[in-house]
């Protein structure tokens, strides 16, 4: 059985491990570590909204999502699922949970992903996000998406 709950500072090490494993395959493609691999998860856990999907049988976190509020807009800053747990619906469950959470306060949610993360771009389009711009930030080629909630 799985549940989604608010992340706590005690989850930091599991979240960092998931980020490292999930984004490792992009290091060579991008030429450096993707932003989620160097994110300050303790800061996110203390200052932003972090949700985890957890196996209730063994307390193992399967994935996480980080939501930040920037200029009165909600951003899905980071979402990842442990690589051996992909394609099992955990990312979709987390995304739906986040969208429901944000819909109580806002009518849209935004996100960005790296241009070279093709499967992420395709996935976001499949689940209803619309691309609205492309921009290079801190050396990362980013594709920006928005979704009406």
Task: Identify the residue ranges that each predicted region occupies.
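Conserved N-terminal entry element of GNAT/NAT acetyltransferase domains
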Residues: 1-10
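Acetyl-CoA-dependent GNAT
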Residues: 9-12, 16-78, 82-84, 95-97, ...
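Active-site acidic-Proline motif in GNAT/NAT acetyltransferases
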Residues: 82-84, 88, 115-116
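Conserved active-site alpha-helix within GNAT-family acetyltransferase domains
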Residues: 92, 116-133
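Conserved GNAT acetyl-CoA-binding A-motif
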Residues: 102-113
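Conserved beta-strand-loop-alpha-helix junction that forms the acyl-donor binding cleft
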Residues: 111-121, 137-141
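Terminal substrate-recognition subdomain of acyl/acetyltransferases
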Residues: 142-149
């Amino acid at each position: 059985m799985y549940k989604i709950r608010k992340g706590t500072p005690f989850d930091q090490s599991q979240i960092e491990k998931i980020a490292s494993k999930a984004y490792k395959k992009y290091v060579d493609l991008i030429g450096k570590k993707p932003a989620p691999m160097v994110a300050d998860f303790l800061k996110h856990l203390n200052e932003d909204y972090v949700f985890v999907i957890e196996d209730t049988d063994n307390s193992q976190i399967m994935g996480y999502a980080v939501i930040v509020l920037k200029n009165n807009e909600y951003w899905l800053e980071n979402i990842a699922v442990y690589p051996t747990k992909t394609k099992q619906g955990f990312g979709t469950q987390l995304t739906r949970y986040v969208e429901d959470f944000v819909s109580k306060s806002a009518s849209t949610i935004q996100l960005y992903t790296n241009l070279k993360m093709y499967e992420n771009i395709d996935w976001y389009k499949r689940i209803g996000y619309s691309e609205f711009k492309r921009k290079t930030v801190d050396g990362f080629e980013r594709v920006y998406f928005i979704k009406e909630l």
